[in-house]
């Protein structure tokens, strides 16, 4: 469950290292975001000499949450941290690699480019 002011790790090689959620895209009064939701975030930590700088506002899609994800067949997926992948306005990832296994639900939400870059799909 990601809400505004939540810190997230970045799961790709775009150059950002840590994000802070400032808004959840999709509804005017949504309180929480889950896996597959798009958020507006600000960069809190970045790698030097990359296109991103601190305090830059970006969009990201959530790929890992500490809150468990329950599927209809009874499987529960739970990660150790909260993480997101930086995307552009069209929904394509800015990085060229993704460092974690991601949930199958992202394929159903039309993030096929992120799914194809991931090393494993759970």
UniProtKB/Swiss-Prot annotation:
InterPro entries: Ribosomal_uL14, Ribosomal_uL14_bac-type, Ribosomal_uL14_CS, Ribosomal_uL14_sf
Subcellular location(s) of the protein: Plastid, Chloroplast
Protein name: Large ribosomal subunit protein uL14c
Subunit structure: Part of the 50S ribosomal subunit.
Source species of the chain: Cicer arietinum (Chickpea)
GO biological process, one term: translation
UniProt xrefs under Pfam families: Ribosomal_L14
Key words of the record: Chloroplast, Plastid, Ribonucleoprotein, Ribosomal protein, RNA-binding, rRNA-binding
Major subcellular location class: plastid
């Amino acid at each position: 469950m990601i809400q505004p002011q939540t810190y997230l790790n970045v799961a790709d090689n775009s150059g950002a290292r840590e994000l802070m959620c400032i808004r959840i895209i999709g509804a005017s009064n949504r309180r929480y975001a889950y896996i597959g939701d798009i958020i507006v975030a600000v960069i809190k930590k970045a790698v030097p000499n990359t296109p991103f700088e601190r305090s830059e506002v970006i969009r990201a899609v959530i790929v890992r949450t500490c809150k468990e994800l329950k599927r209809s067949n009874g499987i529960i997926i739970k990660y150790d941290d909260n993480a997101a992948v930086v995307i552009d306005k069209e929904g394509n990832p800015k990085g060229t690699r993704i460092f974690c296994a991601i949930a199958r639900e992202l394929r159903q939400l039309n993030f096929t480019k992120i799914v194809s870059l991931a090393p494993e799909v759970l």
